[in-house]
Amino acid sequence: MTFAVLAAGEGSRLEHEGIREPKPLIRIGGECLIDRLIRIFLSCGADKICVVVNSRRPEVKAHLESLRCPELHIVVADTPSSMHSLRALAPILGDKPFVLTTVDTVFREEDFRRYLREGDFAVTPWVDDEKPLWIDTDGGGFITAFRDEGPCPYVSGGIYRLTPPMMQVLEQCIRRGEARMRNFQRALLAAGFRLRAFPMERILDIDHRSDIAKAESFLSRDILLVHRSMRYTKGRPDDRLLLNAVGRILQEEDFRISETSEETLTAEMLHRPLHCVLSMARNPETLALLANCPWPVVNTPRAVLNAARRSDEDAPAPCWVKRNDYAEHPSDVVFAPNEAARQQAVEAMRARGISDIVCQHHHEGREVKFYGAGRNFFRPDALPALREKALETAAEKGLEIWGGDAVIGADGDIHIIDFNDWPSFSSCREEAAKAIAHYAVHQK
């Protein structure tokens, strides 16, 4: 099998952001981008790997030559576009189909192996590009259109299976003055080629400094669990039981799990690449530490703080007098049936050193607890109107794992009276743990 890599670009955006290494030699998880591709191609049975590099960064060619890989063929060419770089490879590609990718395309190896068996053009629903090439497909999975404007179900993943007849179309495009790969792809459709799309969950490009951390996180099999302080659990073990259940499921999926508490979390624990951090932390110092974490944190510190700021209500009695961050004691939430009880509850909290207090409206009706993880898990699932209102609130606060309490009045009106980050999911812990583990892996 023949593979080809376009590695002749300048990487100007990365250079502008202070990255000195040429793009092919940028390391993801300790491995150069070009080395990673070559290793994967060889493991997939490559008998020829053709790479085009430019003359402006001779260290790339020198690095490739140092690999002493007999399957590797190097072309040096300074080209104005990716189409011209592909054309420079044409003389050494031979007369067989080949798989083409750019040097900065990052994917999971298992996804790539399935692509080789089943697809022609890799596509992904994951959009993280400034100017993605949107793709429409038909019911059989064949590409019907390449579009500059979305949305469409997929965007191009930058991995293509091409044939010698397709290279003739490339030559025609260049002779017409075309320079962009997306126009070459459109020309293939216009020429009647049937291009079978292969969806891959996520494919990343390294265009900016921040993309390096994204790629390392994407490929990492390490997940850190941060347990909530007993200060915020009211002495109950439910929170720890939930996070432990999530950790067991992730271990079964071959993730390496490490654990700490919000009191013992250190910056050093966040230095290695992490697929994500599942954090129940609420301590302000811990949230400040996590705010500087380069890896995905679920829930984000900003969202946790948003959840803590429940409201600025000052409702008259009858009402609920609440501590306006996190309840640590039963007396942090008090029902006041009249104004005297309301004032007494406020004064009692102030006497305990609590200054941030809200008085929340009391609503008559049926109280319901609800739980959510992302957009795909919600309990109780028999209340679609509550689900929509809860999802809207979660989006406003930026929460990914959430829950709370609502009152449903006799007229059907829904009032959300409490909304929290990382509830215990006590009534549905096992199924919630599966949903949270899925969200941790896929972050959707």
For each feature predicted by the language model, list its residue ranges.
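Conserved beta-loop-beta/alpha segment of the NTase-like Rossmann-fold superfamily
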Residues: 60-137
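Conserved N-proximal alpha/beta basic substrate-recognition cap immediately N-terminal to
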Residues: 229-318, 326-327
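Phosphate-binding site of ATP-dependent enzymes
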Residues: 153, 334-397, 408
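Glycine-rich phosphate-binding loop of ATP-grasp-fold ATP-dependent ligases
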Residues: 82-83, 130-134, 319-345, 366-369, ...
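C-terminal active-site "lid" helix and adjoining low-complexity regulatory extension at the edge
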Residues: 220-222, 395, 399, 408-444
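Conserved alpha/beta core of the MobA/IspD/sugar-nucleotide pyrophosphorylase nucleotidyltransferase superfamily
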Residues: 3, 155-222
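Conserved core of the sugar-phosphate nucleotidyltransferase
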Residues: 107-182
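N-terminal nucleotide-binding beta1-loop-alpha1 segment
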Residues: 1-19, 193, 220-228
